[in-house]
Swiss-Prot record:
InterPro entries (UniProt xref): PurM-like_C_dom, PurM-like_C_sf, PurM-like_N, PurM-like_N_sf, PurM_cligase
Family under the similarity heading: Belongs to the AIR synthase family.
Protein name per UniProt: Phosphoribosylformylglycinamidine cyclo-ligase
Origin species: Marinobacter nauticus (strain ATCC 700491 / DSM 11845 / VT8) (Marinobacter aquaeolei)
Pathway: Purine metabolism; IMP biosynthesis via de novo pathway; 5-amino-1-(5-phospho-D-ribosyl)imidazole from N(2)-formyl-N(1)-(5-phospho-D-ribosyl)glycinamide: step 2/2
Principal location: cytoplasm
Superkingdom in the source lineage: Bacteria
GO biological process, one term: 'de novo' IMP biosynthetic process
Amino acid sequence: MSEQKPSLTYRDAGVDIDAGNDLVNRIKSTAARTRRPEVLGGLGGFGAMVSIPAGYKEPVLVSGTDGVGTKLRLAMQLQKHDSIGIDLVAMCVNDLVVGGAEPLFFLDYYATGKLNVDVAAQVVEGIGQGCEQAGCALVGGETAEMPGMYEGDDYDLAGFCVGIVERDKIIDGSRAQPGDSLLALGSSGPHSNGYSLIRKIIEVSGADLSQSMGDTTLADALMAPTRIYVKNLLKLIREVDVRALSHITGGGLPENIPRVLPKGTIAALDTQSWELPPVFQWLQNAGGVAQEEMYRTFNCGIGMVICVPEDQKALAMDTLNAMGEKVWQIGVMEAAESSDAEPVVRYAPGLLTA
């Protein structure tokens, strides 16, 4: 008589469908808090349906996707998962508002080797908080348990967002011109970029992550969630002629500002107009990082750069200050020698005080 083969299940292969269902039930209330009137239906369908908001004449949809890089590894090391979801939303929605778009809805992708429902629920709760801060709806997502692809309950994240803007209100930077003022909005820390270098600095320096860093610890300074500028910038756009916006992410100031400027222009930045926040000073000193490398790796305390006409600079700064933003003038727009020259950043210490 032949020996009966064992009856294998999906759970035997490392995939727990019940855990996935448990997670969905736990996050339904989080998604419900973010709901917008345009959302049709709830979580659990094959596709989320969202109508175009009323009042638009020529609506343009704007989409974006991003992740949080190796900040995830630091989150796992510190067992701090409650704010990484805010980072995920911020990286997507801040990119959308650069074009003048209001974020409408957001979806996430959570991939792991073994689903830890408690950790995943913390992450999604953070995603919900981020969506509330940005005013967009969390309409769905994907939780992928993939044994053999990730070690243990290590996880990776990706976010996807769609926003909307009136065609004649699109901000594409094409109207930025010499003489315009460049304003900076303060960041909360490294946000979600440069963490491979940050982790290398921690490793090489043997840093104690519990050490004091200003009024917090080094760990908390490095894990501070990315600022979400959406609501304040949308208000600013209604009050001021915003000609360009640049979200300072990977590549820092010299890589991101030129992305939104027309040919034949230079963004002249007064590097004496602000002081590196303590966490960036620590990174530079502990890692022996050159100044140029700091500027092209980290945001160095600046999360967003705004280009406005010189005669609207005061109004823009007053408006942002009234909303609680830390804002200052960082530079001015200049003309390049050739109208065909690619836009660049020029460091000009003392420019604004000369």
